[in-house]
């Protein structure tokens, strides 16, 4: 009987091993330095979004390991030792109120840990810092000169191409956004036809351009040359 059970479990172990190897193989194919990778931030706003993302990733990994570990322990601890035991219906009972309360409180704490930096990130993305707010500038490690006279770019989404207008300089370009490093850039977004998505993965988040609605985003680049195609 033991030998037959071992033979029956062999395909499952082999399948699990093969699945793990395939998963590791595809994970090794990823590239952090890809031109459009949001995991390689080059600006203040993108760095803030990256930090929030990694915080949620580490919390998710911890919860996955904790819940998975508890599940495996229970499956091993209370497994059926024999066929007769497997046919028995176990005693039905209500769970522990203390455990349920602890899990609810722990979930609330985790939500707060995620909510606070997320809300701060939303505020940061939706408002260019006031150059006269010294406390905010010190918190963000910015100089007043970086925020003053921020560059304005009016972006219009059209079918098959983008139009970039620099009203302060009287310049209009197509499909290429040019700006200096270490200087705040405010991008006003609008569309003349269909819905477009404007995204600078290394600099800021993705914003949708909705017909009849104007949106905006802002960023500060950390380096002089950033190419995205």
What do these predicted regions represent?
Residues 1-31:
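N-terminal secretory/membrane targeting signals
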Residues 30-53, 76-229:
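Non-transmembrane, membrane-proximal soluble domains of secreted or membrane proteins
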Residues 28, 53-81:
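Alpha-helical transmembrane segments
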Residues 20-24, 73, 157-159:
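Alpha-helical structural elements
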């Amino acid at each position: 009987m033991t030998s037959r059970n071992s033979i029956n479990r062999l395909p499952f172990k082999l399948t699990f091993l093969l699945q793990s190897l395939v998963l590791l193989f595809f994970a090794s194919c990823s590239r952090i330095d890809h031109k459009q990778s949001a995991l390689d931030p080059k600006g203040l706003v993108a760095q803030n979004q990256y930090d929030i993302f990694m915080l949620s990733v580490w919390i998710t990994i911890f919860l996955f390991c904790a819940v998975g570990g508890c599940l495996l322990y229970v499956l091993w601890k209370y497994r059926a030792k024999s066929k007769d035991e497997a046919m028995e219906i176990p005693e039905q009972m209500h769970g522990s109120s203390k455990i349920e309360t602890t899990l609810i409180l722990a979930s609330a704490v985790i939500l707060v840990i995620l909510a606070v930096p997320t809300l701060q990130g939303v505020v940061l993305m939706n408002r260019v810092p006031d150059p006269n707010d010294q406390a905010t500038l010190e918190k963000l490690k910015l100089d007043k000169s970086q925020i003053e006279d921020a560059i304005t770019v009016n972006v219009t989404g059209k079918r098959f191409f983008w139009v970039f207008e620099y009203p302060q300089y009287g310049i209009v370009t197509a499909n290429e956004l040019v700006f200096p490093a270490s200087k705040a850039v405010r991008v006003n977004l609008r569309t003349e036809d269909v819905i477009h998505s404007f995204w600078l993965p290394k600099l800021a988040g993705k914003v949708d351009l909705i017909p009849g609605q104007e949106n905006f985003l802002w960023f500060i680049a950390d380096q002089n040359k950033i190419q995205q195609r």
